[in-house]
């Protein structure tokens, strides 16, 4: 797909959309700023006056740091309020209500479906296949359904939440090739740092119908800062930026995120990722040995999806031990499952101890 034709996937009424021109988007220079109706005084709660001015819509330092981290050009990258905002922008920007479908692969992160329904875009499901080695995406079925349903967006969560499985790059490439000119393939790599599968960002040079979602919420421990990243064709990024709210990145959050991407902070993050991966292996081995545990799915994320003979009993036992996990029982095909985030060694041991006590009491 050429750089110009990627915009053919965008809603016709938005292709020439100029968006809102904020005071910060103008290139004017000066030392007395009276163009945005901001206060001339700092709030007493803000002694450094760091939040008196509206923020840079796309902070240049942070954008450059994120581009270096993810291996793309800054102009291929949009910063938003978590990946949630990027998902919403994609659905609103590409899907005509009641016409252009959004394809998802349940069980999967729920925001894709939420954004589709808010846009009144048809939602198409191609469920993950639950095989002997865990859940996996059926790429031929996904492609066939995307083509037959007029899907404009195909969301591939890799590693998948809550299933934990990742999609090999050659499979993603199959989807990209088959859907060129038809749909944008969005690879959500929120848990990519924990995975053995390389990032799909490396495919951007060959496929303009690819978008990749990344976040600082998981491996980088900045969930409350709400720093999400959309990586895609530069023209598509520029257009979606015009559809975005004027000031999506608060200055304190941008400053914290940029500091988190410094060399010393990244080294700490790398060590913590290694610890999570080690704990993931340990917990998997320990959980499969527990009576009452029916199945522990392989995971490329920072969590494990576990099926229980008595999921309610396991859930309540963990709560009584002060441990809160994600109840998946309302999700189709996961009526006996809990998702357990991998914490510290001590936290994970509390999980094992609580589940062990439950089985001993039931014996």
From Swiss-Prot:
Cofactor: pyridoxal 5'-phosphate
Gene Ontology terms for molecular function: histidinol-phosphate transaminase activity; pyridoxal phosphate binding
Catalytic reaction equation(s): L-histidinol phosphate + 2-oxoglutarate = 3-(imidazol-4-yl)-2-oxopropyl phosphate + L-glutamate
Family statement drawn from the similarity comment of this UniProt entry: Belongs to the class-II pyridoxal-phosphate-dependent aminotransferase family. Histidinol-phosphate aminotransferase subfamily.
InterPro entries: Aminotransferase_I/II_large, HisP_aminotrans, PyrdxlP-dep_Trfase, PyrdxlP-dep_Trfase_major, PyrdxlP-dep_Trfase_small
High-level lineage: Bacteria, Pseudomonadati, Pseudomonadota, Gammaproteobacteria, Lysobacterales
GO biological process, one term: L-histidine biosynthetic process
Organism: Xanthomonas axonopodis pv. citri (strain 306)
Bilayer-crossing regions: none
Name used for this protein in its record: Histidinol-phosphate aminotransferase
Keyword Transferase: yes
Signal sequence, start to end: none
Record keywords, A-Z: Amino-acid biosynthesis, Aminotransferase, Histidine biosynthesis, Pyridoxal phosphate, Transferase
Subunit structure: Homodimer.
Associated pathway: Amino-acid biosynthesis; L-histidine biosynthesis; L-histidine from 5-phospho-alpha-D-ribose 1-diphosphate: step 7/9
PTM sites of type N6-(pyridoxal phosphate)lysine: 218
